[in-house]
Amino acid sequence: MKIFSLLFSLFLLVSVMAENRIPAVHVPGSVGGTALCGEGALLYLAGEGKLQIYDTSVPSKPRKISELGGLPNWESRQILVHRGFAYLTARHRGVWIIDVRNPSKPLIAGTFDTAELATGIEASGDILFVTLRVFGVQIFDISNPVKPKHLNLHRTFEAQSAYCANGILAVGDWGNSTVLLLDASDPARPKQLSRIELDGFGDGVYIQENILYASTGHNSRKGTQKERKGAGHGLEIFDISNPRAPERLGGVKFPKFYSLGGDFWTPRPAGPLLAAADTHNGLFLVDVRDRRNPRITGRVILPEGNQKMADCVGGIVPGNGVIYLAGEKTGLFVAEVPESRPLPPRSGTLAVRTKSSAKEVPGFTRYECGGMVRRVRVSGNTVYAAASDAGLLVFQNTPQGLKEIQRITGNRIYDVDISGSLLVSAGNGFELTSYRILPDGTLKKLGSLRTWIPMQIVHLYEDGKIAAVSGGTGRVNFFDLNNPEKPVQKKYFAEKRILYIDVFPEQTLNGFLPISVHGMGLSWYHLNGTAAERLENNPSVQFHQLDGIAVLKDRFFIPSKRNGYYLLAPEDFGKAGLRKEFRADVPILGLPMWDGGKRLFLSDSRNGIVSEFDASSPEHLKLIRQVDVHPGTAGRAALLNGRLVIPAGFSGFYLENSKNSD
């Protein structure tokens, strides 16, 4: 009887929505994208490498007044206009700043790097919030709007979107199905006030007069695994008058749906209605005048994109009698909704109250680099730091400590690797650059190559003859460095999912190279000189996107998702090794580095902790110590004459004062 009632209710719900299908009119010439926002009578749409600005003086007929190229393409996620500047998140390509003070002539004013995938964007006064997925929320001082300064990185589970009102920052946390309420009145030191559980993956949030609207999607918390899948789509409403004790008022469910890729959802008030973008499900209009009993009054479904299903609804902007929708593939649409009204102007006034500071770690000296240190490499007595917007920095070891002897600027440097006297960097603008390390440790440029391929991770193999490169996409790229003055793209392979972080080991074993593909297990490659071959993919065991791989003696070491680890022999592509999971006395996670002897280091980037293990017996790792550099983001460790070197993102890098005797 219960099943019959549920099916009948679902039938009625779908029938009501079908009777209230609202047409949407396409705006010719508009680009496909998800990044859409409004400011006054203007609309800002970013996608396909462009920013388009529309005049909506006649609400039903947006008129394009300008278009700017040279922006990220599919990477663009969300856009916000604040004090005459548009801030556009672009995942691994950071945040882009566009000067829109003259809407008819927008100009790119700059870009800046973020600690992880720049996804959501929010601003209040002098403060900018960028949600970064598993690294949380990064907070910037934008009192100078074109030169943001890092203030803090507040860790959350998987931050997707954010909204700030009256000093309260609501964060839609994705995979753990929650909304976090933070006290952001002191932006450098946000404090969590409460954690709200949702019945669906968290994402878009909006605060209106102490009422929190939270859009949800993907899977529900309730029922069997089969019942939960795709049943998390909906809208939930909370009273946050007391942000430490939110009260759930009501909610409404949308039809079941599940598809990876275009998986984001957004709520925005539209007069007495609430407009909720729900990916390929379309846009739902919800009457929220009775917040304890909201009801669906209409639905907009976009035309098909390129997946034989309705296109994904990205950003939405309520207007006078209309709602504007961004189709991820199909462009801008206008739906007539007579009750709709524009959102009120923003009035946030947050400002920097205190300065955040990097941690001083006992036994270590911290070196500030002026940019986010993503990687350090060591050659002899010299340390090379890939310091993002600060460039490539070279430090010489002296009895008084490290001394900076060279700084190569002019490009954002994401990564660097060394083989013998060859150093190769991966930089912004899709640039691979090779250098010769001179006897004094300084660098002499040999050559460079600019391509259309994103480059953020680089590893050198086969005595520096070949470089493996990734850049936030699903491509594994190999470059021939036989002549380092003229790097040549040799071959590329397309994996099914993204290469999330540093997915490569630092060495191969007999030419075998496993890489971790997010959600798709291990792909095995074989290298021989400058030749690269993809052998097979084994998706049977999946790994966490922030864990890496290292050679450990005669096998590959990789953390499991259950705080253990595997030891994989290359001869059978690790199949036998995946049948036995080893354990240590502490959780095993992060980017591993083996010193070639008995020490193994694991850098937990998200939590800022580096763990050192005695790996004399790889099957029985023993913890020696842990070094906490939080709030820094610990990158893969290196050693300088036996002393630990830890890249720590916006905290610079740390060098151990003396060799650890344990």
Where are these regions (language model features)?
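Feature marking well-ordered beta-strand scaffolds used for ligand recognition
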Residues: 17-662
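Bacterial N-terminal signal peptides
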Residues: 5-15
